């Protein structure tokens, strides 16, 4: 079972809790253990501040993943970590890339969850594995390949 804490630190429209949960559970289903995580939905100012603090980049990015660094045996429920998603960036990217807002939200939540599970896209081989899994999961939701018409990775972090 997933214990999901959803924090809305913005007045902008955001997906419903049920949708966020569905996308997380889909991405995390390979993990058999109970898990706990947080999704914080932020405005551009907070997104920029966090990206600057943790990545030394002076702009808001779409999703930041903060995997927990606590041994599972020390917790009642294993803590996966936190996702911080900048609502304005998600909306802007979806419009610029001609994607539905729901498909882009689903992609970024799944992408962030995979980071919490240890997936990465720094090396080409790792990126191919991660993107392949993202495509598969999004197809299950009926969403198109997020990388199909994109010569560059749409994930900006």
From Swiss-Prot:
Binding of Zn(2+) occurs at 111, 115, 121
What are this entry's molecular-function GO terms?
A: metalloendopeptidase activity; RNA endonuclease activity; zinc ion binding
Entries under Pfam families matching the protein: YbeY
Q: How is the cofactor bound?
A: Binds 1 zinc ion.
Which keywords does UniProt give here?
Cytoplasm, Endonuclease, Hydrolase, Metal-binding, Nuclease, Ribosome biogenesis, rRNA processing, Zinc
Q: Where is the composition biased (Acidic residues)?
A: 147-157
Q: What is its EC number?
A: 3.1.-.-
Q: Which domain of life is it from?
A: Bacteria
Give the residue range of the signal peptide. none
Gene Ontology cellular-component annotations: cytoplasm
Annotated region Disordered: the residues are 136-157
Q: What is its main location?
A: cytoplasm
Cofactor(s) required, per the database record: Zn(2+)
Q: Which Gene3D superfamilies match?
A: Metalloproteases ('zincins'), catalytic domain (3.40.390.30)
One GO term (biological process): rRNA processing
Q: Which InterPro entries match?
A: MetalPrtase_cat_dom_sf_prd (IPR023091), YbeY (IPR002036), YbeY_CS (IPR020549)
UniProt subcellular location: Cytoplasm
Can you tell me which family this protein belongs to?
A: Belongs to the endoribonuclease YbeY family.
- Biological role: Single strand-specific metallo-endoribonuclease involved in late-stage 70S ribosome quality control and in maturation of the 3' terminus of the 16S rRNA.
NCBIfam families per the UniProt record, alphabetical: rRNA maturation RNase YbeY
What is the recorded name of this protein? Endoribonuclease YbeY
